[in-house]
Amino acid sequence: IVRRLVGSEMCIRDSSEILMHGYMNQEAFRLSMQTKEAHYWSRSRKCIWKKGETSGLIQKIKEIKIDDDQDCVIFKVALGGLKASCHVGYKSCFYRKITLEEGQYIDKLEFTEKEKVFDPHEIYGNAPNPTKL
């Protein structure tokens, strides 16, 4: 089904709340199907990684949908561990929003999650973090 690098959206099975966006190649998709746990292709490290392998934030796959071009998949998941998905400590990687105002360009981000679920330094230590906070 997946023969190239595809975008992968993760959302909570019961609420459809979007958790994160990642990428999968054919091998990551195969591993995800076999284990029923999300695996991704790291574009920066050039390797497959299993979500939660270090953090315990495992994503148990419950349902998979694929778009008409077969270049994007949506996984409905149940969260393991601390019930979070974002490596900076929030439940979702989509913890900020851009407010739309008529006729204006706004480049300010507004936080939608007020508190972190966990302290990322307790889990990841001083590992490099590419996220722009």
Task: Give the role of each language-model region.
Residues 1-7, 11-12:
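Single conserved hydrophobic/aromatic residue that forms the stacking wall/gate
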